[in-house]
Amino acid sequence: MNRLGRLPLPLPPSVCLFCRFRATASLPSSLQATRSMATARLRRRVARMTLSPDVAKPSVVKKTRGDKERFGPFAGMNQTEARIRETPRARSRAAQKRSGEPEEDSQKESPLYKALKMQTALTPIPYGRRAAIKAKIADITSFDQFQLLPVVRNSISSQALPGLVDVTPTPIQRLAIPRLLEEPKTEKKPTKADDDEPRYDQYLLAAETGSGKTLAYLLPVVDAVKREEARDKELEKKEQEEKAREREERLKNRAFDIEPEIPPLSNAGRPRAIILVPTSELVAQVGVKVKALSHTVKYRSGMISSNFTPRRIKNTLFHPDGIDILVATPHLLASIAKTEPYVLSRVSHLVLDEADSLLDRSFAPTTTEIISKAAPSLRKLILCSATIPRSLDNLLRKRYPDIKRLTTPNLHAIPRRVQLGVVDIEKDPYRGNRSLACADVIWSIGKAGDAESEGPYASYVAPKTKKILVFVNEREEADEVAQFLRSKGIDAQSLSRDSDARKQEEILAEFTEAPPPPSPDEILLAQKKRRYEDAIPFEMPEKANQGSSRRLANTKVLVTTDLASRGIDTLAVKTVILYHVPHTTIDFIHRLGRLGRMGKRGRGVVLVGKKDRKDVVKEVREGMFRGQALI
């Protein structure tokens, strides 16, 4: 402290500022780094003293045009270079539809039968195989090219196909008859490994509906029966000669000690060939064809079913003269075989007509039992069907791996001469009333004229009656639909399992038998009747009243189930109405197969409702138009 008692003021440093700055710069680098890190935030330069990196960019940002705005009405103006794309841009589906061009990804879309593939029921057959079969049978044009007996060949035009001018074999007949006429191979001695394998030849005849499958297997069977009959007569003659020679020797050696002769086994109740069919209606139809050939070929045939009385069945099967060909149902034949085991002891040919039905769940045990009992004497097993479901194909591959498959090129296809129309019952005026839509379609068909000419006798006879089949899915609805149609003035009848057997035969006869051409007496009678009606004037008001009544004339309708969809030869039917959409393509084939038989045209109509599979109906219709096989 100084004299005034205060602290002395600090003296100014003797070192100048420049020297002090140099001393600070000469500090160690470690101390300097520590100091710079501590004061880094304080030493950051302010924004106004830093240049902006966007100085070179313009203040107004130029908008880039998108792909949609790049091309416009003025896009090509003031351009210095051509903007050509290396790869053109793909057009939208809407633009392709407007221009009518096919879409680029049409091949990636689902092909035909997308809906049917989801419920595939039939076994597919490659089209290469179909083409090979078609080329193979192209050279066969006449029944004379088959190695048939002369008496059998001459009976084809007179008994099997009467009334036809040009008698030519169908594709299935060209395939099946030569193969079925082949003699079976020489039997080799069975071994232990071959005990379970069948020792007879197996054949599968698969062809479209109405293609003549019945005649394809019937002619070879009749030919084989006649050949066996001739061989049996020769053997019987030799046996009688040997027995006579032995009898003479016994008489010489032992005149008073003669052994009693064993009587030969009777042929009563022992058919040579059996044809199995699933229904009694098919028994009657096939039995008539078998009987027709017997008039000229001379063999004994018979048919038995549940429609016949027990006395008639016994007289037919156990006739003293024997029986050669028998047509029966599996359950009836199996029940007879339990009490009469010799019924199947002489069977050399066994035919399963409609094999897909005879080998399904309901018939398979009975049919298999009959085949196993007839196996010791069986030489040929023939399976015949218009459809090959997957279940049948798997069964045949497992049980009969060596079966010979004879399939036609048009298997599983509905003929193109059959047209299919679709009626939407949800639209006006039906509004979901399926029965009303069915009645309206029938009235339209009945009132329309017949497209085909009725022949040169059309002006002499009465108008031709139109026959229409209506298929329903449930048997209970057959009577209901028929009753509704009758209330609308339509001559309709129902046919189902609940119908009387005698009534079934009468009804089916009207729809299966084509009317023959009128005789000269019938033409004269029709002319007299017409002159008589025209000469009485007071009958004209009655005719007018008849015409004004709500009755559909010259039209008959049969409402039925699948009972009449398999094998029934409905030559007189030109129209089929599917009251319900069938469950599978198999039902489509069999129901529409009642049309287009023997080369005739037909028309099918399906009623489609709100809950029906319209996509399935559409694909079936497209497949029919293209002539392709269904799946």
Swiss-Prot record:
Gene3D superfamilies: P-loop containing nucleotide triphosphate hydrolases. A motif (DEAD box) lies at residues 353-356. GO terms for molecular function: ATP binding; ATP hydrolysis activity; RNA binding; RNA helicase activity. Its EC number is 3.6.4.13. It catalyses: ATP + H2O = ADP + phosphate + H(+). Pfam families: DEAD, Helicase_C. One of its GO terms (cellular component) is nucleolus. A motif (Q motif) lies at residues 141-174. Residues 68-112, 180-199, 229-249 are annotated as: Disordered. Residues 1-45 form a transit peptide. ATP binds at residues 207-214. Keywords: ATP-binding, Helicase, Hydrolase, Mitochondrion, Nucleotide-binding, RNA-binding, Transit peptide. Residues 194-406 form the Helicase ATP-binding domain. Residues 455-631 form the Helicase C-terminal domain. It is found in: Mitochondrion. Signal peptide: none annotated. InterPro entries: DEAD/DEAH_box_helicase_dom (IPR011545), Helicase_ATP-bd (IPR014001), Helicase_C-like (IPR001650), P-loop_NTPase (IPR027417). Residues 98-108, 180-193 have a biased composition (Basic and acidic residues). One of its GO terms (biological process) is maturation of LSU-rRNA from tricistronic rRNA transcript (SSU-rRNA, 5.8S rRNA, LSU-rRNA). Belongs to the DEAD box helicase family. MRH4 subfamily. ATP-binding RNA helicase involved in mitochondrial RNA metabolism. Required for maintenance of mitochondrial DNA. The Q motif is unique to and characteristic of the DEAD box family of RNA helicases and controls ATP binding and hydrolysis. This is ATP-dependent RNA helicase mrh4, mitochondrial.
